[in-house]
């Protein structure tokens, strides 16, 4: 072998860090590949928080984040910074994950410089390019550019084939978030790490956080800003007042469009606990201990079934139909009444709860990163 093939892994958000951590680990174990992590800075604070927990460091920080940035401004800054990096670094291949602005811009910048690019979590689709916004368009555009499509499921593979993507460029791998979850559960079996998590969450929530039943909530999607978030917050308030024995724990995203309605409508309710965004370690512990989850997060839809936790998806559509079909998740929308009614049903009706909690996770077996790296090796003719 003349030299190692260099793989630049682009990521900028907390979910990207979580889902790419197993891939970075697998790349570093491959004898023919050299891995560099390039951070774009989209979610700078939350990104670096979880990167440290997941055991990797950022080799290059492009530092694109600015307060109150527009999508157009972010796109322009990303293109300038990513292209500048590529000009001097010339990787043999680049990897992106998911559907962020980083994904689309990095794919386009690599295309301009004729650098192959692999897309982890390729093929997720909803019927409209406006939902989720702007993520649906980001991933559709990226799929026209990339060289290797790492589809998490057969459904994602089928979506790519319908769009004319060549079958020999698609690898069905499972979702890397399941790899990340299994890795973290293994770490939390270590007494010192478990004690650290318990202490951290006791400080954030209270000494009874693990013994008092609770519902876990996440919500941050741009498509819900405005009336959608108002409805979600009103639903949470209604549920908290109906179930005083439960705590409703909400790690609140830093985006002001989330912070404002959440603090206005939910602050001060005795059994609603608003806490800062948590690192991945703490969040896995919360998922593992909760009764059920209300979320608009894609990653949570994929992780929670492995923990036996029902998920109510507070969106009008989802690019993850496998969970809905398997019965691990239920699409309820962002309307207050639907969120309240479906949560009541799960909390009050044991058969309905058990049916979702016992459904099988359709998103993978924890070996997705291994399959991705093996395919990259074959791309370069490596064993």
Language-model features, listed with the residues they occupy:
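Nucleotide-activated sugar donor-binding and catalytic core shared by glycosyltransferases
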Residues: 1-250, 255-383
